[in-house]
């Protein structure tokens, strides 16, 4: 109703940008006539104008003025370098990003190209632009591919990848535009704040950031803290015993019924009952699980969580004797990530694999707080509108929906609901068969590894050839290959949460990727050095058509052959000969089996892109790549038209996800760029969402209507109640994230203060004066501890005051209580200030006699050492406070306010401890070679 009265607010936003689009289009002809050199010289012109800006606001003003011309220049550079012209809607996207907003653009609308516009414009300031993607592969692809536009226009482009040295990182962060991943960026920030000398710091101050797949990073990952940790010793046998005991404890079926513990799936939490505590204590032979000397409660609670809430092949998989977490949103494995607080060890004990050491947090930050460090932040995604409130409240980011370049022809069918899971899976298999027989490609999204394998077995039973894409290592290897062929006529692909974001499904098959695979097949065995590799790549022969294709461990020799049915045709003889020639040239240049696998992969990737190269091997491969692609295109082109005629890609959802956004991402795979397509969701009352949030009502309805087991119901009311359930879940998770954010905000303010202090020390401001102030404050605190101005002077404990001062500063050994007897409180303070300064001068001369400037180094070293050590302890104390603070709610107190107050007091105490410890350490410092006479003074 409001929309009808006031008009669509999104349309109003877009309308505001329209005059700028017109202006850019009017500039197009003039800019087309410029030579490459003239185009490049525009960059220097813009930079000169920006150099005149005196502050951030003036800089932003100039950027607004040059935006139309800068965008027109990027558009022209895109045509010259990439052969791609920015559509008008992509220009709109670029403006939204430059404004520090989120641009919602549908899958296949060229988000990657859009990012070049604001990246170039903001890169002109020389302050650095970070373009953030979700994985290393996409960061590298974009830096090589889109980076050409920026390099052509004279801006420097950097790339940050896992495993890079600090020197390389520093060089790449110093570029005008840097492509990286969210985790590399966050961990570099934390490492920079643990650096001991300025030379170790790799990042510059933050300026502007564009996040690709912004919803996945700012919402799905928001509660995941980035943690740098160090090991601590905990006895592993406790985890093993706790796992044994958890097996014997029984879950409570109904509230207040018999049982040792209750499980709250909604909160993902477990609570032990009184019987449970008694039973666990009996089994362990202890009197109290919370005994300070021998605590067990934490271990038992984690063991129950591992048993009930962490499910194998859903939340994690076991790979080579390790527990590897599976991302619940993308279905990808997250190697190297571990659950904290002993939970990972509990899962290791449950599965009987080796238990790894528990760790202690050295530095941590959540993505929420990390990205708020940027003065200007923006992002792109296909799905953000459903989370608009959160993005605006937490990050102050507005969402603007960018219209599609071509009208969508996708058809979303109504959901169907079955009484039980078995009936649902049979119906899904039936629909796969129908589509397969019609020659339409099908993509089935499942929510876990386990479920994808259930469906795979059903399809095998019906003799339907299909590909399986889930977190299992054998399938991950072929992820891009499987997704690239998912658009072939009659192809059936089962994917866990559509893991392969970033790879488009092209109707009729992806001839680019087929050509890459063919080159790989010929080049890899000849050029890659042999590895003693157990996880070998072995693909089934044609005889095993109906088995899900994957990867078989145990073969020593890698097999680079892709399954033959991937290629639509045999290569013509002359093309095959050209390929053999190119391979021979590569071997002659580099030597047989002489390069690491990744290097050869990279050569093939660059050959298939348009990036300029002076490597003769890549040039040769590029020529042959074009020939192979052309041979395949003749077939995939025909197949594309056939698939379009039959209705395009059919997407099947097998469960509503907790978030509507993830469902929309799956739907968005069909009907890209104006292609036809359809989507259909199959659900059952046993699905998690319905079970946890409101399935009873629907079950009651079905019973009332006497619905058969395998009879689906399809109704608008049902779809609405499902969306209601999803909204409930979204609100529930939003509240959880908001709570994390509010609590983390307390930590964040402290983190900013401590990191700013640390950076000041690192940059070597006058540390001597700082240490002297520390010493004076410490003396003041000692005076106040032993002297009460309210009491008469004869009751002051001057003996203790002096001995305490000497404990901190041994060079005050000559002072006695008599020296301060007649003084007022203030005079005592002033006297001690003076004595401490004198003592410090003596200390400095002693230390510097060993090596000139040694005292300055010692000051820096001790301040940093104390900050790091006490901050580490403070993080643990704050974590413990946060865990226990919830109980204050029972005493009618607001836990958050209590947490803020106590956290602040603990922070102040930590700062006092840092001061005192630095003073003590510096005066105690005895560098080697110090004259003996001094040592004897102690």
Swiss-Prot record:
Its EC number is 7.4.2.8. The keyword Cell membrane applies. It catalyses: ATP + H2O + cellular proteinSide 1 = ADP + phosphate + cellular proteinSide 2. GO terms for biological process: intracellular protein transmembrane transport; protein import; protein targeting; protein transport by the Sec complex. It is an enzyme of class 7 (translocase). It is a peripheral membrane protein. ATP binds at residues 90, 108-112, 504. NCBIfam families: secA. Belongs to the SecA family. This is Protein translocase subunit SecA. The lineage of its organism: Bacteria, Bacillati, Cyanobacteriota, Cyanophyceae, Oscillatoriophycideae. The gene is secA.
């Amino acid at each position: 109703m409001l929309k009808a009265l006031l008009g669509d607010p999104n349309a109003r936003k877009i309308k505001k940008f329209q005059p700028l689009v017109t202006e850019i289009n009017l500039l197009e002809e003039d800019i087309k006539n410029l030579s490459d050199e003239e185009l490049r010289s525009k960059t220097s012109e813009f930079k000169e104008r920006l150099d005149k800006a005196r502050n951030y606001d003036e800089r932003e003003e100039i950027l607004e003025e040059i935006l139309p011309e800068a965008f027109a220049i990027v558009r022209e550079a895109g045509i010259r370098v990439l052969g791609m012209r920015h559509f008008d809607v992509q220009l709109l996207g670029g403006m939204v990003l430059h404004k520090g907003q989120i641009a919602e653009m549908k899958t296949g609308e060229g988000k990657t190209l859009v990012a070049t516009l604001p990246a170039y414009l903001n890169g002109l300031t020389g302050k650095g632009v970070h373009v953030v993607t979700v994985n290393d592969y996409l960061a590298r692809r974009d830096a090589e591919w889109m980076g050409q536009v920026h390099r052509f226009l004279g801006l420097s482009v950097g790339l940050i990848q896992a495993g890079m040295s600090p020197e390389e990182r520093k060089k790449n962060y110093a570029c005008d535009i840097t492509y990286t991943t969210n985790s590399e960026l966050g961990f570099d920030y934390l490492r920079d704040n643990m650096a001991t000398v300025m030379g170790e710091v790799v990042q510059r101050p933050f300026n502007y950031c564009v996040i690709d797949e912004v919803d996945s990073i700012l919402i799905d990952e928001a509660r995941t803290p980035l943690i740098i940790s160090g090991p601590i010793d905990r006895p592993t046998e406790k985890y093993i015993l706790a796992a044994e005991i958890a097996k014997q404890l029984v879950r409570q079926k109904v509230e207040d019924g018999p049982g040792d513990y209750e499980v709250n799936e909604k909160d993902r939490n477990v609570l032990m009952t009184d019987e449970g505590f008694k039973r666990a204590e009996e089994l362990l032979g202890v009197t109290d699980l919370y005994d300070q000397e021998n605590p067990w409660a934490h271990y038992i609670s984690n063991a129950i969580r591992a048993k009930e809430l962490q499910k194998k092949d859903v939340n994690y998989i076991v790979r080579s004797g390790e527990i590897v977490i599976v991302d619940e949103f993308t279905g990808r494995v997250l190697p190297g990530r571990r659950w904290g607080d002993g939970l990972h060890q509990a899962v290791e004990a449950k599965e009987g694999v080796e238990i790894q050491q528990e760790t202690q947090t050295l530095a941590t930050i959540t993505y929420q707080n990390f990205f708020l460090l940027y003065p200007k932040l923006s992002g792109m995604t296909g799905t953000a509108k459903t989370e608009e409130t959160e993005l605006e409240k937490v990050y102050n980011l507005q969402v603007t929906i960018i219209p599609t370049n071509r009208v969508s022809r996708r058809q979303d069918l109504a959901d169907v609901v079955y009484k039980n899971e078995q009936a649902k899976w049979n119906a899904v298999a039936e629909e796969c068969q129908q589509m397969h027989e019609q020659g339409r490609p099908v993509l089935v999204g499942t929510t876990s590894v386990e479920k994808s394998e259930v469906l795979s077995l059903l399809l095998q039973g019906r003799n339907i050839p299909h590909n399986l894409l889930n977190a299992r290592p054998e399938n991950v290897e072929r992820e891009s290959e499987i997704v690239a062929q998912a658009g072939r006529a009659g192809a059936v692909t089962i994917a866990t949460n559509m893991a392969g974001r970033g790879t488009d499904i092209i109707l009729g098959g992806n001839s680019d990727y087929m050509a890459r695979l063919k080159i790989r097949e010929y080049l890899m065995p000849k050029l890659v050095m042999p590895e003693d590799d157990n996880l070998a790549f072995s693909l089934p022969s044609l005889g095993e058509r109906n088995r899900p294709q994957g990867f078989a461990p145990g073969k020593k020799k890698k097999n680079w052959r892709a399954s033959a049915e991937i290629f639509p045709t045999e290569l013509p003889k002359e093309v095959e000969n050209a390929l053999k020639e190119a391979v021979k040239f590569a071997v002659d240049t580099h030597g047989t089996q002489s390069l690491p696998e990744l290097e050869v992969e990279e050569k093939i990737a660059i050959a298939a892109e348009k990036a300029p190269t002076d490597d003769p091997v890549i040039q040769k491969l590029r020529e042959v790549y074009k020939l192979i692609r052309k041979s395949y295109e003749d077939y995939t082109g025909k197949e594309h038209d056939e698939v379009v005629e039959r209705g395009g890609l059919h997407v099947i959802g097998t469960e509503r996800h907790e978030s509507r956004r993830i469902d929309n991402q799956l739907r968005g795979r069909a009907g890209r760029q104006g292609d036809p397509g359809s989507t259909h969701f199959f659900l059952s009352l046993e699905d998690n969402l319905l079970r946890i949030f409101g399935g009873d009502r629907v079950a009651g309805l079905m019973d009332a209507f006497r619905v058969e087991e395998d009879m689906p119901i399809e109704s608008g009311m049902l779809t609405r109640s499902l969306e209601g359930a999803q909204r409930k879940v979204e609100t529930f998770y939003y509240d959880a994230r908001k709570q994390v954010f509010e609590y983390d905000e307390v930590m964040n303010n402290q983190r900013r203060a401590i990191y700013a202090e640390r950076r000041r020390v690192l940059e070597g401001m006058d540390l001597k004066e700082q240490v002297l102030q520390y010493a004076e404050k410490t003396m003041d605190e000692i005076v106040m501890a032993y002297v009460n101005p309210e009491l008469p002077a004869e009751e002051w404990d001057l003996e203790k005051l002096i001995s305490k001062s000497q404990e901190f500063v041994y060079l005050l050994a000559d002072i006695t209580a008599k020296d301060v007897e007649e003084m007022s409180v203030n005079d005592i303070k002033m006297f001690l200030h003076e004595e401490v300064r004198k003592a410090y001068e003596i200390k400095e001369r002693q230390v510097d006699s060993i090596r000139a400037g040694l005292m300055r180094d010692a000051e820096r070293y001790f301040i940093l050492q104390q900050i790091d050590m006490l901050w580490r302890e403070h993080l643990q104390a704050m974590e413990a406070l946060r865990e226990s603070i919830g109980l204050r709610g029972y005493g009618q107190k607001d836990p958050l306010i209590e947490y803020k107050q106590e956290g602040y007091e603990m922070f102040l105490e930590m700062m006092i401890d840092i001061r005192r410890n630095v003073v003590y350490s510096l005066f105690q410092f005895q560098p080697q070679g110090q004259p003996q006479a001094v040592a004897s003074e102690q």
